[in-house]
């Protein structure tokens, strides 16, 4: 075991040589430098993993679980995650086998080895009264808000995943971008990491602010490459306002990324009915947009 620091980010591991509880082994791993309450919080946050010989590491949370000789314990420790409180998502509909959520900006779609307490699926598992498992079937960037589906069983998860993979879903995005975008609907086919990528971009409105010109786009994608919309907007010379990775200009500094997955339509895997969700019909979402941009930006429902 390397020296543990309660103030620094680090990854640590411990070879289990004798049976004892997970909490006791975690105490050894952290060299008694964290309280029992903090250790339990790390378990709850999903920062602790256990590897059994000839198997992949798995996330473990139960403090009283007995570990066996030969197993290996891993801790992925980021002290700042202990202090973070995730934003609150909104349930748009619950069909029992799956539910529909509005994921806010700043909430991850999925966890990482460092933890999953701030991911949408884990928030739902720990806050929803039904205590059902929540499985992700598609993703949104952490800094993009929008509509997400969560499955509550493996069968429905596979069915919903197939809908996205076979492009039986319709997704539409809204993005405020820098500059004056041309009025004609535009197709961007700039390859991403050597793979084909297609995005349609349509100007809805544009305004002149103190910081400069900005345009509201509606975007639909035919492929799902990583950061596709953000990369294509930047490739066209109109980076998304607030995008710190692909071309944030100084005049728009301090703003959240102005990208929302506002529309989702898909065939229900249970009833076969077409389910359609549109955030522009949600008062809470409209209030957030009006707070950021004023009341004149809202588009017509389609």
Where are the predicted features?
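Short beta-strand or tight-loop elements
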Residues: 87, 133, 173, 188, ...
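Conserved hydrophobic positions within beta-strands
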Residues: 91, 177, 200-203, 240
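Pseudouridine synthases involved in rRNA/tRNA modification
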Residues: 1-43, 203, 209-214, 232-302
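Short beta-strand segments enriched for Tyr within beta-sheet-rich domains
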Residues: 160, 225-233
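RNA pseudouridine synthases
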Residues: 1-193, 286-293, 300
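A generic structural motif
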Residues: 51, 178, 220, 267-269
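Short histidine-centered loop motifs in beta-beta connectors
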Residues: 60, 202-204, 212, 217-220
